[in-house]
Amino acid sequence: MKNKRENDYLIHRILEKIEGSSVDWRKEASGNRSLKIQQEDFNRAGKTELLEEARKLEQRGLIQIKWLEYGNDIEKITYRLEQAGQFYELLGLIPKWERLASEKEKIQTWSRKAQTGWLKAYYRNLEEALEKGKQPADLEKYGEPLFICLDALEKLKEPVYQRVFSVAVLGGTKVFENVLRTRVVSILSEYHPDVDEAMNDKEVLSQVYLEEYAQELAVKGNLRISLKGNEISLDRKSVV
C-alpha cells in the first residue's frame, strides 16, 4: 500500500486493524472502533484522495469523521465492527472469519482421517490456532501436500524408501526430500511419542518406517525374491 494513491486506502486500513486484533475479526464482534489519521496516511493515500474517500464512506453511513479542520484535516474516523462485512464487500474480499472457517473445515477433515495420537494432536493445535485468529504457517507454506504426506506416513506398517514413498504419495521422487522432509521431521520431533531429542533426522523418520537407500530394511514375514528365473525364499534360505 506504500506510496500508492488508492481510493480505498481507508478501507484497507480499517480491515488491517480489524484483522490484526485478537477479537475484532470475529463475525459476532460488535462495538465502535476508531482510527487516528496521521500525516503518513495523507502521504501514502494522497490528501485529496483520502479526504474524498472519507466523505464518501461517511455518506454511506460506514464511518464518522472527527475533523481537526473541517474539510481539510481529519483527527480520526470511527466505524462499527458490525459493519465489517460491508468493508470486505467494497473490496471484493472474503472476510477473515470465513477464510479461517474454511481452513478449519479442511483441518477437521484431515483430523477425522488421523488414526494416531501424535497426528491428532498436531491437527488439534492447528485448529486451536485458527480459533484464535492465527493462520498457521504450515497452511500458508505447505498446505494440502503436507497433510497428504502425514496421512500416508502414519498409515505405513512396513519400511519404505523415501523416494518410493515420495513418488507414490506426492507424485515425484524428490518432492518429499526437497519440500517436506525438514518440516515432517520437525512435526515428528514435536508430536511423535517415540522420538527423542537425541535422534537425528534419519532416526526420526525411521519411527514412521521411512528409510533412506543407504539403510538396511527390516521386513516382517516371509520374503521371496525372484532372481534370474529362480525364487529365493529367505525364510527357508533355499532356492525353490
Regions found by a protein language model. Give the residues of each.
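Nucleic-acid enzyme cleavage-core boundary/entry regions
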Residues: 1-240
